[in-house]
Structures are given as structure tokens and as C-alpha cells.
Amino acid sequence: NGYSYQGTIIWKYMALTRQGTARTSQQSYANWIFYRYPEILLMKAEALIQKGTQADLQAAYALIMQVRSRANALESDETDFSGIINADELEQFLLDERARELMFEGKRWYDVLRFARRNNYAKIDYLMDLALNSAPTGKQQSLQSKYGDHRSHYWPIHDDELKSNQSLVQNTFYETSTTIKK
């Protein structure tokens, strides 16, 4: 049939229908959606949290709950933000909700990095803990060393791009001693 899968597949990307079969490589014509409406709501909530007034925090909370309601998410103690809302706690709740809502969409690293970088890397420990907890024991020291250098948080620009565009400059973490001929 042109494909084989072992284990679990991410059905929202592979399915033809809810109960149907997975797409074959010849049927890979999916219209990839980069921004879904729930993500737009969560982006707005993040912006409101950054504004920081209680009215903005209440509005941000309402947007997060709108996303959760649409997804039929279970209620828990962590979803109760009645009364005065703490901006840091709501921001963490938002980050967790983005992880749940946008799972497998390739956005988590950028969410965590944006969260960690805010206010001059005030929350770099969050990024470091997340990375170290998911790394094998033998890789943790090198990972800690690499991520400790803030310049490493973005990929290098490919050599072909540097050669074709004279205005581009390599990300400093990935500069080499050899000169790239443009």
C-alpha cells in the first residue's frame, strides 16, 4: 500500500477521515495550517498578560478558557484564577496550554525560548530544566554548556544562504575560522 507505520502516528496529520486510513505518500497534498484560530487566541492572551493590568489578565484568562472549552479540556485546580490574578502564574498556565493545544505543531521550542528570553533571560532556568530533563544523562553536561551560551539558541544560517546573500551574517555561535566565499 506504499506506507508502513510502527507504533503511534499523529492522526491529525496522517488521516484521510476520522475513522479512515492513513494517507499514502502519493496522497500527501495536505494544506498545512500554520496558525489555527486557537493559537491566535493564545497569542492575544500572551500579549494581554504582558500588558499586566488586572483587566488584561482577566481578559487573557477568558481567552485561555475559551480555547480549553472548545477542546473539552478537563477542569482542575490549576485552572482556577478567581480573584486577583498573578501574572507569572497565568503566564505559566498559558505556556502549559500552548504545549497542550499546539502539540506536534513545531511551536514548543519557540514558545519556551520566548518565555525564557523575556526580561533579559529572567526565566532561563525554565528552558534549561526542560532541556536537561528530556536529555539522556550522558548528554546533559554538554547540553547545559551549550544552552548556557545564549547565542546557541538559534540555528546557523546555511552556507548556501550566506553565499547567495551578501548582507547575511552567520549567527555568532556558529561562526568558524574559515572565511565563507560569497
For each predicted feature, which ranges?
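Acidic/polar-rich alpha-helix caps and helix-coil junctions
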Residues: 1-182
